């Protein structure tokens, strides 16, 4: 296992925090968002804009294009993420999977307030601000510490430079192994 290189713990969601938050009494939509975000490393905006056609159940992948970069998304799903998305597909009354009771796509700030509430519960004696982008950074750091290649991590997160925009990582088994082993 590699050591911690990139960020200090105030900048990313740790595995310990992830486990604490996922067991809190918070809205299910937020908990689903948290699970998918930490497991896939996708940007919040990409998760919030997931549509039915972005879920390939046969290949067990999220597909489409990233909102920010327009890069191709082809993210292999672990069992828990797949189960969450299957449930959301089954219950979806509109094309988008993360919508409020009126059918409107959630805004990042809606989930941000629950994320901040969770951190206040974890650290009641500290003023600590972690925004929801720390979920994505936590995924990156978590996978990196468990020896998943940078290429695989960046491909899963749709984070590629102009020099490697044709990068394609079909086999994401290292990520799935680490996710399934440590994020039960």
PLM features per residue range, with description:
Residues 2-7, 11-44:
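Basic, Lys/Arg- and aromatic-enriched nucleic-acid-binding interface segment
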């Amino acid at each position: 296992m590699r050591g911690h290189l990139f960020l200090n713990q105030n900048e990313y969601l740790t595995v310990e925090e992830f486990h604490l938050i996922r067991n809190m009494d918070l809205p299910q939509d937020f908990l689903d968002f948290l699970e998918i975000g930490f497991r896939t490393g996708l940007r919040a905006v990409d998760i919030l804009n997931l549509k039915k056609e972005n879920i390939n159940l046969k290949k067990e992948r999220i597909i489409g294009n990233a909102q920010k970069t327009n890069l191709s998304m082809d993210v292999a799903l672990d069992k828990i993420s797949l189960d969450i998305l299957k449930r959301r597909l089954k219950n979806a009354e509109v094309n988008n999977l993360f919508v409020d009771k009126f059918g409107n796509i959630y805004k990042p700030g809606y989930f941000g307030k629950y994320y901040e509430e969770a951190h206040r519960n974890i650290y009641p004696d500290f003023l600590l601000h972690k925004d929801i982008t720390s979920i994505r950074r936590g995924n990156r750091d978590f996978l990196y510490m468990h020896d998943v290649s940078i290429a695989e991590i960046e491909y899963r997160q749709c984070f590629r430079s102009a020099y490697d925009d044709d990068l394609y990582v079909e086999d994401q088994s290292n990520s799935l192994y680490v996710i399934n082993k440590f994020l039960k």
